[in-house]
């Protein structure tokens, strides 16, 4: 099975070490462009762009990097409850057209109640998933060309529609990650690809089985992906030394403050990440070559595959055997590590190389819209 390998744009910061300004790197547009172009040339299929108040806006970052890349796809965040699903569908179609079909979308319900309240979203965990289901139902149908009336508990629209369709038909794929039962129910009904953070293979297998069963009950099939950091070197010894070096500036106080901050999250996935290490830096290899050191201070994906190329490839294949076909990798610093992954890991995997993007023609091939709502009358060509 050919694997889709994505990279990551560190719009929330980058550097050689975690938890310190030592070795930190300024992340500006020029640096993000370097990473995106490297990923494009090295054969990564796409890049995940993170979302949240600690990050640059993922949509604007993607739009700014489309003109300087050729094949790379951009996985950007949809935020239910923060934006109208109809407006989000229009934005998604525009990004897909401007990128010639290189737009992918990642549904993010959010897991930090404090940040969500600051964004104006005052829903508890269950309510957020209710709203996310409603949002996604509308978003999908509008992108697929339907005129939508929807009267939900959280969202109501009447006559919602899209005038300019996306390049990808019937619409761009939807990705989503979540570990709660409500999240799995949403994935089973709504998404093309279910993402998990890098838990041990046995835990990942259990989640995949649960989502598969739920999807089958609705007559659907779902693809699977995983989000992991990678520390790959020419030897296993060098890789583990690099892992130790990455957290060499972390002190106990920084770890304790980070874990206290992350503990306020109501994200089940975040709780599962934290439980892998419990803030203890002495037992970080939680499964063979799966290292939880990143999660001592980083929210979200907190584990890394560590080893030489053949060793990391063997672990990747273990996940692939569970049914995972998409791997979203990252590493510190992200520019250099993109080369290491491509040079040391790719040769040991069957990596699906991206094709040249489609040509979109014109955004509006039929002239100006009549009264902002009606397609101009078609004239037969003789």
Curated annotation (Swiss-Prot):
GO molecular function, a single term: alkanesulfonate monooxygenase activity
Highest taxon of the lineage: Bacteria
Record-linked InterPro entries: Alkanesulphonate_mOase_FMN-dep (IPR019911), Luciferase-like_dom (IPR011251), Luciferase-like_sf (IPR036661), SsuD_RutA_monooxygenase (IPR050172)
One Pfam entry name: Bac_luciferase
Annotated keywords: Flavoprotein, FMN, Monooxygenase, Oxidoreductase
GO biological-process terms attached to the record: alkanesulfonate catabolic process
Documented EC number(s): 1.14.14.5
Induction annotation: Repressed by sulfate, cysteine, or thiocyanate.
Protein family membership: Belongs to the SsuD family.
Function: Catalyzes the desulfonation of aliphatic sulfonates. Seems also to be involved in the desulfurization of aromatic sulfonates.
Other observations noted: FMNH(2) which is absolutely required for this enzymatic reaction, is provided by SsuE.
Protein name (record): Alkanesulfonate monooxygenase
UniProt source species: Pseudomonas putida
